[in-house]
Amino acid sequence: MSSNYTRWGVAALVTVSLAGQAVAADNITVFAAASLTNAMQDIASQYQKEKGVTVVSSFASSSTLARQLEQGAPADLFISADQQWMNDAVAKKSVITRTRYTLLGNDLVLIAPRSAAAKAVTLDPQTDWKTLLHGERLAVGDPDHVPAGIYAKEALQKLGAWESVEPSLAPANNVRAALALVERNETPYGIVYGSDAVASDKVKVVGRFPANSHKPVEYPMAIVNDHDNAAVKAFYDYLKGPQAAAIFKNYGFTPTK
């Protein structure tokens, strides 16, 4: 396996969903956690077909997006992959507090390349990570700031494995970068969200972390300060509705009931 996994942590993943139209001043701009990439692209396309409104989405680690909002980056809606970075956005007055809404849930899984011979792994305090990794690296979101990495660290600590596993981590700048390391067979295993595994045909889930090993994986959203207009509110409501929920479910998320 190659060792150039670090280059995946250089830049945030930015994707523009234009649905065939040129970018216009009245487009809706969404800052969304990287794990939402596929689902939000599909929702943006569907919304454009139904409403004739273009949604432009930028995907990156929630920490990166929260910091960009604090610095005045133009966006209408923020969707974080954890409550911590939404708390930060609220504290910095980047978003409108009353519009905060927990939109989705997710789970935390261990993945391996689909082409690999990796077998199912029971993730508990008895898991032998040293034998499992066999001197190789474990792809994760950077535990210092990426929500997926923060959840992973919490789960590994709960299972008593953090101290032994930490030296073997291959930290990435967002969860999709961690996924890519496994897709490219640059690491034998990775910790990502269940939805990331659903979105990729190059990896397979070999283990699921117990729900009680980490805080719930939640996706809060809120409208950005001074952007509470009718068009933004309409899309905000659409994300809470049945059409968007069907797409989120298709990608492995659990919409809030």
Model-derived regions, located:
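Bacterial N-terminal signal peptides that target proteins for export
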Residues: 1-12
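Intrinsically disordered, low-complexity segments enriched in Ser/Pro/Gly/Ala and basic residues
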Residues: 1-2, 16, 56
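N-terminal signal peptide c-region/cleavage motif recognized by signal peptidases
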Residues: 17-21
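Exported/periplasmic ABC-transporter solute-binding proteins
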Residues: 24-73, 80-83, 87-92, 96, ...
